[in-house]
Amino acid sequence: EIDTAAAFHVSRTPVRDAFKMLEREGLLEVRPHIGTFVSLIDLNMISDILYLRETLEQAVLRDLTAGYDKSQEFRIRLLLQRQCGLLEQDLPAEELGRAFIINDNEFHTTLYELAGKRTVMDFLTGVSSQYERFRTFLNLGDRDNLLRLYNDHIKIWSCISSRDYEGLSDVVSHHIYDGFNASTEIISRHPDYFCPFH
């Protein structure tokens, strides 16, 4: 606390409040009389968040598909064009990853908004701090994974606009879990960043 307050030229109170919030979200570990540490990425929590996200996203996107209206297409096509444009640029891997994640979040938020379920997305965002860390870690240097996500987004929208419920269910499951399932190599290269499954 003291070092952080000094670095930002603020009193300890706002730093303490920020640390408490980060601790509640599982991002910091406070050990009294020892120090404050960035927590490990909790794979158990991420697995639970993915389960929650898949369950909710399947329901929200089914609702969106049932009420699909051609007028909704403009916003989604614009976001998909932005994603494609990012992938076509020769950006450094970290910059591309960060920009794509922002656009990815906007894509999913827009789907929830079009389905009239923005509050559901706000809830998911509120419980997804560990997942966001993990996702950022996975995507910062992996252009191929970003391309896979973009292609998934195209498939998701194609299924919605053609009212292909079965295809939508399949692509959403893969979209949510494939990155996590493919992360074993990264986890094995950086085991000190992760809490093991239990």
Language-model-detected regions and their locations in the chain:
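Residue-level recognition of short, well-ordered coil/turn positions
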Residues: L27, L91, D142, D164-Y165
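Conserved amphipathic alpha-helical segments that form helical-bundle/coiled-coil interaction surfaces
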Residues: K70-F137, L149-C159, E166-D178, A182
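Acidic active-site catalytic centers that drive phospho-/nucleotidyl reactions
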Residues: E1, D17, E57, D104, ...
